[in-house]
Amino acid sequence: MRRSLAPSQRGGQRLSSRNDFTPPLLKKNKRACQQDLEQERLRQSALRDATNTSDLPLPIRFTANTEYEMAIAKVLARKFKVPIDNYVPDYGGNRTLGVRRRIVRRPLHDPLACNALVLYHAPNYTDHERMSMEPSSVLVHVVVDPLLSNILRPHQREGVRFMYECVEGKRGNFNGCIMADEMGLGKTLQCVALVWTLLKQSAECKPTINKCIIVSPSSLVKNWEKEFTKWLHGRMHCLAMEGGSKENTVRALEQFSMNASTRLGTPVLLISYETFRIYAEILCKYEVGMVICDEGHRLKNSDNLTYQALMGLKTKRRVLLSGTPIQNDLTEYFSLVNFVNPEMLGTAADFKRNFENCILRGQNADSTDKERDRALEKTQELIKLVDQCIIRRTNQILTKYLPVKFEMVICAKLTPIQLQLYTNFLKSDQVRRSLADCKEKASLTALADITTLKKLCSHPNLICEKIAAEEKGFENSQNILPINYNPKGEINPELSGKFKLLDFMLAAIRAHGNDKVVLISNYTQTLDLFEQLARKRKYGFVRLDGTMSIKKRSKVVDRFNDPESDCFLFMLSSKAGGCGLNLIGANRLFMFDPDWNPANDEQAMARVWRDGQKKPCYIYRLVASGSIEEKILQRQTHKKSLSSTIIDNNESAEKHFTRDDLKDLFSFDPDILSDTHDKLKCKRCVQNVQMKPPPDDTDCTSHLSQWYHCSNNRGLPDNILAQAWTDSKCVSFVFHHRSQSQKIETTPATETSVEAKPEPERRKRPAMPLSDDSADEDFQGF
């Protein structure tokens, strides 16, 4: 049976005429078409002029054989006439069939949809206005993608709108802003929404920018890439520069910089501050739509190379992110504002003359009333000026979305060995010479002595080399240590009050639940001791410090946050990973030693109480009772409350101590429960026993004088700490408070309720370097 007419099926036979196939449509050339049209015109003309059948063309002659058929044939052959007077056909035009539809401009997303976030409201045009306007001049709404607007919280919607209005110049004659929200409020998500909106739409129905550069610490480059993938569901790819050879890096950056197309495959460049500084020459050649600087407080010094390199970028849209408000130095404040909006405060000399000198004179103890009034006037003027481009919200907003957070400052007593080493060092000739060498500021010797005391407060192992070498201040100290003391062997927690307390608390946490713990220290040597303790107790752990590569850091964090992971401890160096890490797999955090800068400690302690946390959080800050660590804590509190100009650019606060300050640092009372509480001169306590609770409107962001004060383990919000106080016998005093309004039972075994009373959302202007604490009757200064 033949299936087709193909030659292989016909068997070589010729097709019969009845099987010949002629396609219905033949491609004719222009000349053939014109001949057909001419023949048709002649045929119709013959029909009109014919008077009898014999005059008709031959094909019609056989059908029109009667007068009736003749009449019908003439009607069909009648020429069409356009029913318009004096119509002249346009035979030479290029008109197409039908009417060309008018393009109507519409926003990319529906501005009337539920939860729609409209960043720009277009004019409400009438139909007559639309008809009379050029299509290219019609403006449309700018609406955030519903993929993002449906998950943004109220304060985040406000933040996205604020940043959009700033970078688009709708709030004034500037195009930069500072997002100064505290840690955990979703600054990254707000920036993702802003970047995605600017890359996809504008009021003119085209992208506002074609590419964006996001600069961050090296440890956060991968985190930014994950955030874009997470929130945009893979709709956009980023170019993340992390590692790689120099040749590949140069090639990738040149390709990114030179490409000006709006259809760029990777429109967002994620790069670290260090890498940007190295390859700034490539990135500064071409225009960039916008730059975002994460952890922007790194740019507080306008003289460093990174600041100068970023200022060379050819872009007017600049966004700076920083979770720590600039309170300590007006020069830092100027540097940050000048980076995002170079013309707002004038030059550095103008700022110093118009604002800084007046404000600093008003803060002097011997200032006149006129100078103080002038300082207040200038401060208000400066606040009003920079408020246009700075937005700041506190983490009190999170109380509506996160579990309760309990923060505790624990004063741990020094062990007898620590106590003897500490007092011997303070009485030594070394300290006396350090004080004698100080005139206006601390000498290098005094700074080294301060570091020695800080390490001794953590564990004698940290100064074992000084003891073995019998350095100045530690002569004959070898006799104080136990006979079997071996610093290179297994750690002995009993030699340190803080380590002893930590050991008891970790054991209780491990035994009574599945909570995970973050251990933070400023010294990698202390992390080594944490490791020894974890191995001794057989705790699973991971460690992140400055020696870990960027790629490995994200894997370590993901492993720890995995609920199925056996990692119990996360050991973190505050210098290497104190910013930006999300460690929500843990709900307990120990800040083992304080830093001179309160912002560093706050950044580090914000790692667990963040979006995604499901458990109540416990933050423990350990300080050695009466020691130099309490002095550091007092200065932290003093800076936060007074907002005074203490810390200079890129310098530690300890370099600015006067001789009197050093005398206070090197003072020590071994019998005191808490030097901090004594200096508060708390009116709510009688003989270190709290008689009156703190005001109802206070929380853990309030001054320490407004916290709960405990000289015994009654009334503590944490059963673990209450039990460890009894077992370890090394706790002398505790300050504690919670993150939100919540009743705390004052019983020995306190059960905490995680139901929190939501507080109203607060928008707070950035703190300025002038404040007054006279309204706080309990605050007596330090």
UniProtKB/Swiss-Prot annotation:
Print the keywords alphabetically.
Answer: ATP-binding, Cell cycle, Cell division, DNA damage, DNA repair, DNA-binding, Helicase, Hydrolase, Meiosis, Mitosis, Nucleotide-binding, Nucleus, Phosphoprotein
Q: Where in the cell is it found?
A: Nucleus
General function of this protein: Involved in mitotic DNA repair and meiotic recombination. Functions in the recombinational DNA repair pathway. Essential for interhomolog gene conversion (GC), but may have a less important role in intersister GC than spn-A/Rad51. In the presence of DNA, spn-A/Rad51 enhances the ATPase activity of okr/Rad54.
As one GO molecular function, the record gives: DNA translocase activity
Highest taxon listed in the record's lineage? Eukaryota
Subcellular location, principal: nucleus
Show the segment(s) annotated as Disordered: 1-28, 741-782
Q: Polar residues composition bias: which ranges?
A: 1-20, 741-753
Modified positions (Phosphothreonine) in chain numbering:
T22
Q: Name one Pfam family in it.
A: Helicase_C
Compositional bias of type Acidic residues: which residue ranges? 773-782
Question: Membrane-spanning regions, if any?
Answer: none
Could you tell me which InterPro entries the record lists for this protein?
A: Helicase_ATP-bd, Helicase_C-like, P-loop_NTPase, Rad54_N, SNF2-like_sf, SNF2/RAD54-like_C, SNF2_N, SNF2_RAD54_helicase_repair
Limits of the Helicase ATP-binding domain: 168-343
Name a single GO cellular component: nucleus
Q: What is its EC number?
A: 3.6.4.-
Q: Where is this motif: DEGH box?
A: 294-297
Q: Return the similarity comment.
A: Belongs to the SNF2/RAD54 helicase family.
The name of this protein is DNA repair and recombination protein RAD54-like
Q: Which cysteines are joined by disulfide bonds?
A: none
Q: How does it assemble?
A: Interacts (via N-terminus) with spn-A/Rad51.
Q: Name one GO biological process term.
A: DNA synthesis involved in double-strand break repair via homologous recombination
What residue spans carry the region label Required for chromatin remodeling, strand pairing activities and coupling of ATPase activity? 2-9
Q: Where is the Helicase C-terminal domain?
A: 501-658
Q: Where does ATP bind?
A: D181, E182, M183, G184, L185, G186, K187, T188
